[in-house]
Amino acid sequence: LRSEVLSVEKDDTGFTLELNGMTVGCEKLVIATGGLSMPGLGASPFGYKIAEQFGLNVLPTRAGLVPFTLHKPLLEELQVLAGVAVPSVITAENGTVFRENLLFTHRGLSGPAVLQISSYWQPGEFVSINLLPDVDLETFLNEQRNAHPNQSLKNTLAVHLPKRLVERLQQLGQIPDVSLKQLNVRDQQALISTLTDWRVQPNGTEGYRTAEVTLGGVDTNELSSRTMEARKVPGLYFIGEVMDVTGWLGGYNFQWAWSSAWACAQDLIAVRGQ
């Protein structure tokens, strides 16, 4: 344990591992080294290097389930909202949609909605955010205008949105400082677009430092789906996040690690019993 593996070689009898100050041999070798997420916990590209050494295809990696960072102008406008969370529907350019909470942070946007969509977002793309997924905003505004024409638009929106968010959007000129009866059709349509189709182009993500998973990795086509053994290299197995398998939030990535380990173990047990 806690020994660095310096090299791995294979011959007809199995594998030879050079460690710090010692050599270890084995018939079967299981790579369970994870991805690149959270390097502070010891993440490294070791598993990918082993796969490439033995001729297996490794797909490009990037951070997944990770917060977005924002371009400086937008970030400076929204930093005061750090800690504010709202229900949302967020849509990627490829059409993937998640309905989860969105969280404003000092660095950009986070929360389950953003973490989920980050795995489907590509640099340079926009995401569309609906901050009022449970409200037909046009109908709501028209009904409130008929019932309370002198009520301020700000207070009306605060029924469904956090007060801090409404106040900040008004300061930024996104919400007119008017009463409901003063809200004209053009401004109402612009407001509806702002709150239900807020298009944001992230500057990037927070990267592997805070990512919960790594996208990409050892190509699953290189491995047996039943045993996790490399098709080209008998006796070499890959399990867990080192593979190109990524799940949603909710324990799916843990389950993949456990399930792939179980499948591998069943094969090792069967081989040993022969």
Language-model segments: residues:
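Short hydrophobic core segments
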Residues: 5, 23-43, 51-52, 102-107, ...
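Glycine-rich phosphate/pyrophosphate-binding beta-alpha loops
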Residues: 37-39, 67-68, 105, 109-112, ...
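An anion/pyrophosphate-binding glycine-rich loop and adjacent beta-alpha core
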Residues: 56-60, 66-186
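Acidic, glycine-enriched active-site microenvironments
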Residues: 14-18, 25-28
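A conserved FAD-binding loop/helix module that cradles the flavin
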Residues: 35-54, 245-273
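A glycine-rich dinucleotide-binding beta-alpha-beta segment and adjacent secondary-structure elements
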Residues: 167-246
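Short loop/edge segments at beta-strand edges and connector loops
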Residues: 1-3, 60-62, 240
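A conserved short coil-to-beta-strand element within the FAD-binding core of flavoproteins
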Residues: 1-14
